[in-house]
Amino acid sequence: MFKGYIEGYYSRRLAIDAFKDLKAPISHYFYGPKEDIYLRHRWKEIDKNLKRRILPKKIKQVYCVSPTSDFFKDSKKNLSFLKKKLSHAVEKVGFDEIAIFFDDIDVTNFGQEAADKDLGKKHAEVLNEVSFHFSKQKNIWFCPSIYNLSLSKGIFDEGYLGGLKENLNKHIVIFWTGDNVISEKINNSSL
């Protein structure tokens, strides 16, 4: 099991000193704050001022990108942008690992292909291509559009997750939060 801190919310960044005060040791720090415009709204652009945080060496730093819902309008070109951006973060800036977050994006305007399984398949294809491109990476992390049981009801039902299950490379690490966005515990029935 991995223990980490995900900076992926809409608020102030965690101060460096806070890492010293954590009650439990962590192995990973995920840099993906929603307010960083280069991770979401301007995700096709490379942030020339991007820097790793100064953290204890034992903590792996993961660069997280959240492509917006327009990703699939020109997926071949956008996949090229994505690989370039992730390469910059790993090779030039020195991040240890990478992640793609497809959570919190509006997927209702995709049209017919958003019908359940197809969207899961499309997300899996993107992750598989990134995984192949970064085959030397220890971990490729993924937060799907549906990342807990409470979100799996309604329009997507189980189709989206089925599309992922059938197509996603088994080496990609998936974020799953159990029954709810914040779950006290995750047991087998939550998986």
Per-region residue spans from a language model:
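Catalytic-core regions of glycoside hydrolase
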Residues: I6-G8, S27, V107-L191
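Glycine-rich loops and low-complexity Gly/Arg-rich segments
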Residues: R53-L55, L86-A89, L164-L168
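Hydrophobic or amphipathic alpha-helical targeting/insertion segments
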Residues: S75, F81-F110, A114-D116, K122, ...
